[in-house]
UniProtKB/Swiss-Prot annotation:
Location within or outside the cell: Cytoplasm
Organism per entry: Clostridioides difficile (strain 630) (Peptoclostridium difficile)
Alphabetical UniProt keywords: Amino-acid biosynthesis, Aromatic amino acid biosynthesis, Cytoplasm, Transferase
Gene giving rise to this polypeptide: aroA
Class in the EC hierarchy, top level: transferase
Superkingdom in the source lineage: Bacteria
Keyword presence, Electron transport: no
Name of the featured protein: 3-phosphoshikimate 1-carboxyvinyltransferase
GO cellular component: cytoplasm
PANTHER family: AROM/DEHYDROQUINATE SYNTHASE, PENTAFUNCTIONAL AROM POLYPEPTIDE
Pathways per UniProt: Metabolic intermediate biosynthesis; chorismate biosynthesis; chorismate from D-erythrose 4-phosphate and phosphoenolpyruvate: step 6/7
Function: Catalyzes the transfer of the enolpyruvyl moiety of phosphoenolpyruvate (PEP) to the 5-hydroxyl of shikimate-3-phosphate (S3P) to produce enolpyruvyl shikimate-3-phosphate and inorganic phosphate.
Residues involved in phosphoenolpyruvate binding: 21, 101, 129, 174, 345, 388, 414
Reactions that this protein is recorded to catalyse: 3-phosphoshikimate + phosphoenolpyruvate = 5-O-(1-carboxyvinyl)-3-phosphoshikimate + phosphate
Length: 437
């Protein structure tokens, strides 16, 4: 894997943010479960989205790519039914999730709506991410399964039946989303009961909104239980994916530490959970300027605060950079789930930002960060092969006093393939010979 030499830089200008990965996953799945042909626009073909496209194709959806547009004939359309019969006629259908936790956790229950044996494979840390919620359902419904420890090689056979599903809300909302996608298509009614406090509520809001946009109704009883009528049909439609707040957070955080970037295509009333970055940075003292879907931040210094990571775990790495350069103490709580992402993000944040002179104390499910006046450079840092850690360190380099060497930068392709192109466009200085050019 390659390395980049990134120099301290002043970033300025306008940047169009990539489309929301969370919304794109959901739109591809809902349109693939439909009874007709949908058109999904403003798609960014990151590794994770490609994994979901290929997974839905393997189940019978017919998906054609035209620039940033997907035309999708759903599994329950006339064309899709014929294609599905051919696909599922294989002795064992393999679904490659690459490194996408969303693809894996969304597709497992969806695949069980259809006959046949399915094998889920993947790479990286995906095999270490827990699936116990589904294993409990498999045991209760006599669905056969086998798996290997610490790698993704899951084989399942059987069909998911309508039921009352009791699911913990503090593990990952992806399990709930996976069930919400497929239960409306089963032959009778189901119920999901949430047995603990719910984390990542914003992601469920996105799921419920997208499902409704495609013509399926689910009753939400205050996030305590979800009532799902069976025999519903997803309706094909045209759908545009909005800009991604989890990626916009990198540039808003750059503004917070003194850069001058205007971010385009971030909807003000978005349901995305990571839009909480605006409220957090405002609370720390940043002034937010909006003009339609254009946003930028202005600051003359920020103060530490308390950040609850339970509803917005993906933006914690870059907010840790802001906290490191703020006045006073920032405490990040309820962050234990960051340990089971593409890497142990809590540990990676601590190790890599500490190399740059940040003052961080790592606890089991929290970080305590005392602000410093500047960051040091002149060291080698590692992405831990995690896209969000790589982009976080690139933003941190702007406030370093010397260049940094970033190892394994290519992992940004997982969510934001052209991140370093945009970074350079805004004025970031990078030694390009390490980029293979």
């Amino acid at each position: 894997m390659g390395s980049l030499k990134i120099y301290p830089s002043k970033l300025s200008g306008d940047v169009k943010i990539p489309p929301s990965k969370s919304m794109a996953h959901r739109a591809v799945i809902c349109s693939s479960l439909s009874n007709g042909k949908s058109r999904i626009s403003n798609i960014d073909f990151s590794d994770d989205i490609i994994a979901t496209i290929r997974a839905m194709t393997s189940l019978g959806a017919i998906i054609e790519k035209k620039e940033d547009i997907l035309e999708i004939s759903g599994i329950f359309s006339k064309e899709g039914i014929l294609n599905r019969e051919n696909q599922l006629n294989q002795p064992k259908l393999t679904i490659d999730c690459n490194e996408s936790g969303s693809t894996l956790r969304f597709l497992v229950p969806i695949s069980l709506a259809f006959d046949g044996v399915k094998r889920f494979i993947g790479r990286g840390n995906l095999g270490k991410r827990p699936l116990d919620t589904y294993y409990e359902i498999f045991d209760r419904q006599n669905i056969k399964y086998s798996y290997k420890e610490n790698q993704l090689d899951l084989i399942i056979s059987g069909k998911l039946k309508p039921d009352e599903f009791r699911v913990k809300g503090n593990i990952s909302s992806q399990f709930i989303t996976g069930l919400l996608f497929i239960l409306p298509t089963l032959e009778s009614d189901s119920k999901i009961i949430i047995t603990t406090e719910l984390e990542s509520k914003g992601y469920l809001d996105l799921t419920l909104s997208t499902i409704k946009d495609f013509g399926v109704e689910i009753i939400n009883n205050n996030y305590k239980e979800f009532i799902i009528k069976g025999n519903q049909t997803y309706k094909a439609r045209d759908y545009k994916v909005e800009g991604d707040y989890s990626q916009g957070a990198f540039y808003l955080s750059a503004d917070a530490i003194g850069e001058d970037i205007s971010i385009l295509d971030l909807k003000e009333d978005s349901l995305q959970g990571d839009s909480e970055v605006v409220e957090i940075l405002s609370r720390m003292g940043m002034e937010i300027l909006r003009e339609g879907n254009k946003i930028k931040g202005i600051t003359n210094g920020l103060n530490g605060t308390l950040i609850d990571a339970s509803q917005c775990p993906d933006i914690i790495p870059v907010l840790s950079v802001v906290a490191s350069l703020s006045i006073g103490k920032t405490t990040i709580i309820n962050a234990g789930r960051l340990r089971i992402k593409e890497c142990d993000r809590l540990h990676a944040i601590n190790v890599e930002l500490s190399k740059l002179g940040a003052n961080i104390e790592e606890k089991e499910d929290s970080l305590i960060i005392e602000g410093v006046s500047k960051l040091n450079g002149g060291v080698e840092v590692w992405s831990h092969k995690d896209h969000r850690i790589a982009m976080t360190l690139a933003i941190a380099s702007c406030r370093c006093d010397k260049p940094i060497i970033l190892k394994d930068f290519e992992c940004v392709s997982k969510s934001y393939p052209h991140f370093f192109k945009d970074f350079k466009m805004l004025g970031g200085r990078i030694d390009e010979w390490n980029m293979g050019k």
